[in-house]
Design a protein with these regions (language model features):
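Hydrophobic/aromatic residues located in beta-strands of well-ordered beta-sheets
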Residues: 36, 100-102, 203
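N-terminal active-site segment of His-dependent metallophosphoesterases
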Residues: 1-75, 82
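Beta-strand-turn-beta hairpins that frame and shape the catalytic cleft
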Residues: 1-5, 145-152
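A short acidic (Asp/Glu
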Residues: 16-17, 46-50, 111-116, 164-165, ...
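Conserved beta-sheet core of the metallophosphoesterase superfamily
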Residues: 154-221
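Core alpha/beta structural scaffold of self-assembling particle/tube/pore-forming proteins
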Residues: 109-112, 121-130, 151-156, 160-170
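Active-site metal-binding loops of divalent metal-dependent hydrolases
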Residues: 8-11, 40-43, 106-108, 156-158, ...
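Active-site neighborhood of divalent metal-dependent phosphoester bond hydrolases
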Residues: 48-140
Length: 221
């Protein structure tokens, strides 16, 4: 049986703390999973947000700063992993090279939306700026599920023709009929079900993994 480590939404942006990502990397070293899945929204990309465009909070945001902040956060996560891999090589111990999978989230997809809205940006900005492949990640498009050990991973799973996210882990199992893990929402949620052949299914909303408070959250969220 393989071991999976899931990193939910990290939403790195300029000025926010990232030391918890190094802790997560050290946790990966301690547990040595076979697969590491980042469920997306690692880059918050506030400079491309349409949510508060035109407000005072929007002033001073820069695309390049957003990209660099996310890269620094990812490097913090990967630093302990790379150090452990080099240690194993030096000591001639059993190698550990986990499969690393990144499912693009709606925040990363802001880059694509910006290009679609302004074709002059085509070739100037793009997912290549994230350098995910260079850092060793397999990258899957926004909402493209990747199936690993009979578990479907995606930034979120949709319900109905409108493409809106499912509202609960239980509904996710009812809609997709297989084990699924998603991020996107702040809440954690878990559900279990069993197929007619006795196969167990797991539905998981993985929650979030950042230290800061988002402005759009209320005291009840």
């Amino acid at each position: 049986m393989t071991k999976h480590l899931v990193i939910p939404d990290t939403q790195v942006k300029p000025g926010n703390p990232i030391e918890h990502l190094r802790w997560a990397g050290q946790y990966a070293v301690d547990k040595k999973p076979d697969v590491i899945v980042h469920i997306g929204d690692h880059w918050d990309m506030p400079a491309l947000s349409s949510y508060d465009s035109g407000t005072r909070n929007f002033e001073g945001r820069r695309y390049s700063n957003d990209i660099e902040a996310g890269i620094q956060g990812m490097e913090a996560f990967l630093e302990p992993i790379r150090a452990e891999q080099q240690r194993l090589i030096r000591n001639k111990d059993k190698r550990w090279n986990p499969r690393m999978v990144f499912t693009l989230g709606n925040h990363e997809y802001r880059i694509e939306r910006a290009v679609n809205a302004d074709p002059k940006l085509d070739g100037l900005i793009g997912f290549k700026d994230l350098k995910l492949e260079e850092m060793g990640w397999e990258v899957y498009d926004f909402l493209e599920p990747v199936i690993i050990d009979d578990i479907a991973y995606s930034h979120y799973f949709t319900s109905g023709v409108m493409g809106r996210p499912v509202s609960s882990a239980k509904l996710m199992l009812q809609k997709k009929y297989m084990s699924c893990v998603m991020g996107h929402v702040q809440d954690r949620d878990v559900a279990f079900a069993r197929k007619a052949d006795g196969t167990n299914m797991l539905g998981l909303f993985a929650g979030i993994f950042y230290q800061h408070d988002e402005d759009y959250l209320t005291p009840q969220t």
